[in-house]
């Protein structure tokens, strides 16, 4: 028997990125650059690996930059459609708007993925599990990484969502799971979403849970939050694994030293400058003999000659 797949996926990428400021004043959070493509690339690749041949991405904040980031990711045989939001609709409202525009098709369940995480999940069997059960929504779940940092999902014996707790120490007998921002949504649940701004926990999960039709499925893989500048830097450093990565459009003096850092597009690094465990991208200019350590510099930022920057976040729109 051939495993079933999700033909259509939607990636949520329209938020303002308030916690990512000041970086999100230059680029939307899902468009932030990383060595293997923008943050949203992992969501796009996951949707493709799950069988999607049509991916809808909603965009609003700095929409043109988000569109450029999506276009960077090469996905053979996949149609990518942008759903522009003049008014920010929220996570549930964005789904409803894409539905009303006919972008999500008219049949089958839809795979919905948050666009602001760095994730690599094994969704083999996830569609089969979702479609075989009488669930309006099925959450992909991971064993919890840090219950005191992120919300906890608790399942009952039938793999229905019993509780969703805020971050905190679990009860001794509780088995907490982490929601990494991936779910399957049945067509009738999509049709029930109000055509108005709203958020998924209230507008989608709430009604499904009230009917005991909000399920969870534990999957294998990894997830890292990219919610704040500190998160972003840590995820980039993990991807680098001790190496330096320099974009082809960057200009780096032969006398500069790049150590375990990401030098992104249009950056200019002068002679004898040292960049260590940092991100420098989107047109940053680093002067002669300057040092940048454990920092993120984005946009029209200019580092003076011999300036020493440690643990800073600087971002200036071009």
Predicted feature descriptions by range:
Residues 31, 153-155, 216:
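A structural signal for short hydrophobic beta-strand segments in well-ordered beta-sheet cores
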Residues 66-157:
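Conserved beta-loop-beta/alpha segment of the NTase-like Rossmann-fold superfamily
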Residues 8, 53-55, 79, 136-137, ...:
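Residues at the starts of beta-strands that form the adenosine-phosphate
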Residues 109-111, 118, 124-131, 142-147, ...:
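Catalytic-core segments of class I nucleotidyltransferases/pyrophosphorylases
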Residues 56-60, 140-141, 296:
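Short internal beta-strands
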Residues 244, 249-256, 261-262, 267-273, ...:
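A structural motif detector for beta-strand N-caps
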Residues 1-67:
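N-terminal glycine-rich phosphate-binding loop and ensuing alpha1 helix
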């Amino acid at each position: 028997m051939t495993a079933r797949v999700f033909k259509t996926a939607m990636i949520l990428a329209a938020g303002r990125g308030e916690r990512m400021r000041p970086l999100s004043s230059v680029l939307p959070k899902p468009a932030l650059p990383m060595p293997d493509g923008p943050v949203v690339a992992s969501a796009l690749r996951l949707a493709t690996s799950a069988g999607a041949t049509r991916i809808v991405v909603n965009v609003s904040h700095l929409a043109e930059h988000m569109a450029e980031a999506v276009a960077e990711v090469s996905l053979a045989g996949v149609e990518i459609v942008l759903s522009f939001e003049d008014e920010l609709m929220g996570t549930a409202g964005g789904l409803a708007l894409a539905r009303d525009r006919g972008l999500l098709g008219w049949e089958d369940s839809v795979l919905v993925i948050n666009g602001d995480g760095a994730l690599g999940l094994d969704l083999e069997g996830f569609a089969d599990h979702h479609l075989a059960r009488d669930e309006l929504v099925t959450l992909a779940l991971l064993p919890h990484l840090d219950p005191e940092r992120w919300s906890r999902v608790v399942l009952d014996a039938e793999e229905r969502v019993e509780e969703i707790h805020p971050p905190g120490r679990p009860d001794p007998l509780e088995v907490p799971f982490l929601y990494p921002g991936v779910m399957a949504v049945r067509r009738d649940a999509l049709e029930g979403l109000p055509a108005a701004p709203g958020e998924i926990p209230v507008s989608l999960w709430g009604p499904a849970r009230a009917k005991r039709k909000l399920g969870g499925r534990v999957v294998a893989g990894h997830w890292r939050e990219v919610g704040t500048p500190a998160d972003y830097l840590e995820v980039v450093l993990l991807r680098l694994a001790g190496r330096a990565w320099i974009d082809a459009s960057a200009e780096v003096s032969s006398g500069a030293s790049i150590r375990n850092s990401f030098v992104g597009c249009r950056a200019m690094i002068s002679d004898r400058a040292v960049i260590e465990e940092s991100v420098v991208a989107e047109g940053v200019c680093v002067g002669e003999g300057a040092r940048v350590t454990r920092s993120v510099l984005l946009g029209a930022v200019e580092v003076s000659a011999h300036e020493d920057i440690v643990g800073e976040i600087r971002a200036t729109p071009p």
